[in-house]
Amino acid sequence: MEKLTVYGELCVDEYGTEWNTEVELEDEQVRNIIKILMLNGGDTDVERMCLKDTFPDIYDVLDKACYKATLDAYNEYLMSCGKPEVDKLDFKHEVNLPYKFQDMF
């Protein structure tokens, strides 16, 4: 099992919060992601669209992991402000793939 780290940034104040989370993927799924990165030269928006269209099952796994990590990061932020936690996000989250894959090519 290969572990893939997905990352993002949560901008809720002037500082913003970075987070990352590890997702376990089959080796074949990781190879498919690398293939997409190679084909598209590292354009993040294109990666997201191609991944969503070409490998929707992998995209779904990453999307859920990113959603949970964003929700966790947002709740940490709310707690630090003394505000109550929420159980769902009312703003957009994004699937961001790690640059380490892009650096390989």
List PLM regions with ranges.
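Acidic, low-complexity, intrinsically disordered interaction modules
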Residues: 10-105
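A short beta-strand micro-motif
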Residues: 4-10
